[in-house]
Amino acid sequence: MLVLGDALTVTDVTTLHPMGVGALVVACMAILMSPVRLAPVYLLALAIYIPTAQRMVVAGADFPLLRFAALVALGRIAVGGGFRGLSLGGIDFLVALGALMKILCIPIVSGKPNLVFQQIGSGIDTLGIYMVIRGTVRNLADLRRYSTAALVVAAPATVIFLIERATGRNMLSVFGGVPMFTAVREGKLRCQGAFSHAILAGCFFVALLPLWIGRWREGFRGKTIAGVGTAVALLVVFCCSSSTPVVATVFLTAGFAGYFLWSSLRAVWVSGLVLAFILNFVMKHGVWHLIARIDMVGGSTGYHRYLLIDAAINHFGEWALMGTTSTMHWGNGLFDITNQYILEGVRGGFVATLALFGSMVLAFRGIGYWLRRLPPRGMDHFMVYAVGAAIFGQMAIFLAVSYFGQTIMIWYVTIAFGGMIAEQARRDARNPGSASLTGAVGRPAPGASGAPAKWPARPRGRALPPAELMPGGAPAASRMQGGGAEAIRPAPQSGPPGTDGRYLGLAPGD
């Protein structure tokens, strides 16, 4: 069946290009034969370079290449014991709840039971990729490895986008699903690469940007990764010529600019909510009308997005319980749901929307826990903050776009990072210091045969609590007896107990 949209997409039909088959075979072989921690990187490569029109139909079930590779990755991780020791929590429950609501509600509301198989496939795309990240990214060291590998994979894509901008032709159109000739709006080429829309392409790379900026405090190598990653993301955003990725970049910039207010983030959030509440009663059309005023590159559809939010509020009773089959009657052009929060509600009811919000809130809670306990302005502190900035950027993007195709992957990758940090926060809250018992949190250290690794004993001597201060306000020194005289060594700059660099599976000095 052919479905016409912004680009020609093929569903329920096997559509394979020889190069697409080759890419899938290489990705699956790499997933099976290389270290398991690299599995999500190969999924990222498929998402960036292969359109979702490349798919196989097996016994009536649709398998885009990314979905097939995700199943292979899940099997590889499960067989290798990658999920051993994984502690699931609130974020994991909410992500699963959101997927389950859509699997149940769409077939029931539409009256088409056969759609349950389609929704199960979508659930594999979302939950599968989410669990691949949760099984492989278990600490900050894994997160850093992922960000480095993501840059290696994503950087060559800038060449494809620049060629498309220079020629007006998309070289990835040979795979199908994306047009050969680049769309033009207001006289500007809107490059899209392998993605279904230029907006989605820009948002995908903007979502990766915080992971690269988060490396800034790691010396020369970290600054190089941050600089090159920023250039990659900005080049793609420039080629897309869309307001949404530009606005998302502005929000991320504001988020990182607020890093120096990290100790007062709760006050910042409360102030923002109070300001929005006041503006909602002062403004004639409600605070969400502000989105209609945004037009960064010309030809923006901000007013459509305002009307969509307004209509969703006015029709709340229609979709709140189990979603709805159509929003076409909400207003002119409102069948196009360019808001992820509303799309979740339309597909899975208000519970699905709350699950999306709730996962964000719990992620911020876990991030805030570690920000209060890690050495301020250190590289680990900044990396944790960067994950928060990434989620904040997604919150802004979701007001103006709804993800589909391979782009949905980037949200579940991002929230999985939040789930990892929240998991370690729960461990440490229950038993301070327990998050640092193994070389990699939740997994046995290599060669340990399942036995938790033990950290080297501290030097003999009594380390005074951080609260005790020497004259003049300097941190207290630890005193060790040696040679009949009291030797003095500086107290480790560790903050509260259990936060001296071993909090997320990192050895001291990493």
PLM features: residue spans?
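A membrane-periplasm/extracellular boundary helix in multi-pass inner-membrane enzymes
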Residues: 159-169, 240, 257-296, 300, ...
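A conserved mid-to-late transmembrane alpha helix and its immediate loop/hinge
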Residues: 197-199, 234-238, 242-243, 326, ...
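N-terminal hydrophobic segments of proteins, predominantly signal-anchor/transmembrane helices
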Residues: 31-33, 37-57, 63-124
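Alpha-helical transmembrane segments of multi-pass inner-membrane proteins
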Residues: 23-28, 99-104, 144-187, 193-259, ...
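Transmembrane alpha-helices of multi-pass inner-membrane enzymes
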Residues: 72, 266-267, 387-398, 402-450
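Interfacial loop-to-transmembrane-helix boundary motif in multi-pass membrane proteins
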Residues: 39-40, 87-100, 121-124, 133-166
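Long extracytoplasmic/lumenal interhelical loops at the membrane interface
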Residues: 287-351, 367-379
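Hydrophobic transmembrane alpha-helices and their immediate junctions
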Residues: 225, 253-258, 350-395
